[in-house]
């Protein structure tokens, strides 16, 4: 498809614009609880956000890990709808999801590739070369709800899941802070204490 066709398709997938639900994520997950979303659709990740927008609006989904692109690499027509850094960031912030982590993949310019570097898509692929230097090409953004914000009041079970997710993504200090400042979610003092002790050990291990 041309850039014009692809942009038109993405525009049609925005909430309320879909006529023929080709992807059908919205209908498929309509009655399925989605606690966390991981999206990697090779530059088409805005489809995920548009299709599951109701999940973000209702605060059902606690977090998102999504691929993002350095949008200006594309022509102006495509840039408005692809998963550029600014497009994804603004969309998630609109529903009070905050950025907690961002990883970047840098691409060394072709003129400098006469040396041997680490290829991220196999030794025979010379198009993508990951480097500590060079221009950021793409990456991943990790968003979570912050339950300390008034707009993000979540249930006891959701808070348990959120703390577990934060711990899984090596954000134990954030989980501890949420727990410390959201005591109303944990009526059981003993459970509260035990979870804090586990998180403290995780935090300490990161600084040894």
Predicted regions and their residues:
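Conserved acidic-Pro-Pro-aromatic motif
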Residues: 28, 32-173, 182
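Glycine-rich adenosyl-binding loop in Rossmann-like folds that engage adenosine-containing cofactors
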Residues: 1-23, 32
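Intrinsically disordered, low-complexity regions
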Residues: 7-10, 29, 125-126, 192, ...
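C-terminal accessory extensions appended to soluble enzyme cores
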Residues: 155-208
